[in-house]
């Protein structure tokens, strides 16, 4: 089966608003959604889970 080319590659949806993405702002649809995503990261709206190693080992004192 041939791999998808740019011409017939499936279009994605913007993770912020759900609109079709644009190549210039991919994976977003616009500069506004791209900037909103950045502000979410900078404002701690997004968080990565962190495992507390000190609670497990107790050897960090």
UniProtKB/Swiss-Prot annotation:
BP terms from Gene Ontology: regulation of DNA-templated transcription
Residues reported to bind Zn(2+): 14, 17, 29, 33
Transmembrane regions listed in the UniProt entry: none
GO molecular function, one term: zinc ion binding
Recorded superkingdom: Bacteria
Keyword set includes Ribonucleoprotein: no
Keyword Oxidoreductase attached: no
Keywords noted in UniProt: Metal-binding, Zinc
Matching InterPro entries: DNA_gyrase_inhibitor_YacG, Znf_NHR/GATA
Details of cofactor binding: Binds 1 zinc ion.
Cofactor(s) annotated in UniProt: Zn(2+)
Gene3D superfamilies (alphabetical): Erythroid Transcription Factor GATA-1, subunit A
Function per UniProt: Inhibits all the catalytic activities of DNA gyrase by preventing its interaction with DNA. Acts by binding directly to the C-terminal domain of GyrB, which probably disrupts DNA binding by the gyrase.
Subunit structure: Interacts with GyrB.
HAMAP family to which the protein is assigned, alphabetical: DNA_gyrase_inhibitor_YacG (MF_00649)
Family: Belongs to the DNA gyrase inhibitor YacG family.
The protein, known as: DNA gyrase inhibitor YacG
UniProt organism field: Zymomonas mobilis subsp. mobilis (strain ATCC 31821 / ZM4 / CP4)
Organism lineage: Bacteria, Pseudomonadati, Pseudomonadota, Alphaproteobacteria, Sphingomonadales
Gene (name only): yacG
């Amino acid at each position: 089966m041939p791999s998808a080319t740019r011409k017939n590659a499936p279009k994605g949806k913007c993770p912020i608003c759900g609109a079709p993405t644009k190549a210039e702002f991919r994976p977003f649809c616009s500069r506004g959604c791209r900037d909103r995503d950045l502000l979410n990261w900078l404002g701690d709206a997004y968080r990565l889970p962190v495992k507390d190693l000190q609670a497990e080992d107790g050897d960090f004192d």
